[in-house]
Amino acid sequence: MSGTDYEFDWDDNKAAVNLSKHGVDFKDAMTVMLDPLAMTIFDVEHSQDEDRWISVGRSSGGMLLLVTHTFVTTGPSSALVRIISARGATRHERQQYEQGTSQ
């Protein structure tokens, strides 16, 4: 997702609940989009009303996070990302990320 200018949005109430539940601030979660090694997949299971994506990558603070978000292209090199949730990556997700970055 590099080479793209991102604008970020989220629901402040959802961000507060996420911080309390998972200990991850959406301001940290948005930096995952800047990780050139981040992996992003389409979230088929949760995309009934809107297209949702799941990204696993390192935040600017070094945390490996899983971020659920929407992604809407707004121009040739710009996008709006709405963060839905964020949490620390599980052991399995960490292994997938590390395998993907070592290839």
Language-model region placement:
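Ribonuclease/tRNase effector modules and their secretory precursors
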Residues: 1-103
